């Protein structure tokens, strides 16, 4: 297991990881040189995420060829930082959030929060719905393994994985070009339009098998 956490240097500094993106890349290359393919800890979204940091994270995952199966990809692309009670980030969130903020709630375990940038929060909401749908389509016996070749229905799962990556990139580009405004109704509409892309992909490959 390798806790990379981010492909964005500003985020790594905020996480106090004491490492850089280039050092993370070197670590992955070194492990692979010795035939080791680790599982990765990664945080796509956190309270201070920006569209730039999300883009950096996504480009990092693509460059390092980490998104190898639909199970792995779906987890990596929507994972949010968990703010556990007793951690500095939890305490910081408590100090920053007014009591009247309906977007953040605190339990005895963790803080539920909205990302400060509403555009990123909206993007996260869409991608979370998409990724959960992808996970629900996986076979019940599917293991979250980095080697998709161990599954009997590899072509279909590869297609699902490629569709998931394409949806993420297409939607992120829309937010970057401001073609998707932040509006709850529009966000729900975009989510509903993206989900059928999985059904279309799966139907095509079922017809070929």
Question: What does each model-found stretch correspond to?
Answer:
Residues 10-14, 44-52, 68-125:
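Flexible glycine/acidic-rich beta-alpha junction loops that bind and position SAM and/or redox cofactors
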Residues 1-39, 43-67:
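Conserved non-cysteine loop/helix-boundary elements of the Radical SAM core domain that shape
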Residues 90-91, 96-209:
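Radical SAM enzyme core and accessory elements
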Residues 3, 7, 35, 41, ...:
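Residue-identity detector for glycine
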